[in-house]
């Protein structure tokens, strides 16, 4: 399965993120994709529009539900190979790690280490 960046050109992604932010200024565009070396399933919809004041932990909970993970199954998200604190707000993650195309890219895994 192609990554979001492989599916769309930079101009297409930039236009989409600008449109999203203009239409929903209190939300941020997030792309969540499976880490290639994890045994977790691929998520059907990669794009998320999350409230700026949502915590990373709340976002992980939503991802777990979308992936239909069993209650004890661990799920970790990485942004630029970094494990953000679960208490961090998505807005601060976005401002620190947003891509040139206006999206923030998160990679999910069942392992706490990346690489």
UniProtKB/Swiss-Prot annotation:
Domain of life: Eukaryota
Lipid-acceptor residues (Phosphatidylethanolamine amidated glycine): 115
Keyword flag Cytoplasm: yes
Location(s), subcellular: Cytoplasmic vesicle, Autophagosome membrane; Vacuole membrane; Cytoplasm, Cytoskeleton
Distribution of this protein across tissues and organs: Constitutively expressed.
Membrane-topology descriptor: Lipid-anchor
MF-aspect GO terms: Atg8 activating enzyme activity; Atg8-family ligase activity; protein-phosphatidylethanolamide deconjugating activity
Record-linked InterPro entries: Atg8-like, Ubiquitin-like_domsf
SUPFAM superfamilies in UniProt: Ubiquitin-like (SSF54236)
Function: Ubiquitin-like modifier involved in autophagosomes formation. May mediate the delivery of the autophagosomes to the vacuole via the microtubule cytoskeleton.
Sequence similarity: Belongs to the ATG8 family.
Protein name: Autophagy-related protein 8i
Source organism: Arabidopsis thaliana
Lineage: Eukaryota, Viridiplantae, Streptophyta, Embryophyta, Tracheophyta
Gene: ATG8I
């Amino acid at each position: 399965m192609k990554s979001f960046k492989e599916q769309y050109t930079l101009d297409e992604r930039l236009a989409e993120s600008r449109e999203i932010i203009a239409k929903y200024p209190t939300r941020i565009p997030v792309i969540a994709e499976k880490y290639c070396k994890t045994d977790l399933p691929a998520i059907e919809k990669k794009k998320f529009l999350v409230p700026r004041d949502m915590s990373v932990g709340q976002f992980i909970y939503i991802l777990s539900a979308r992936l239909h993970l069993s209650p004890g199954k661990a799920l970790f998200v990485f942004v630029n190979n970094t494990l953000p604190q679960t208490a961090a707000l998505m807005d601060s993650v976005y401002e620190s790690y947003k891509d040139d195309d206006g999206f923030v890219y998160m990679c999910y895994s069942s392992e706490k280490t990346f690489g």
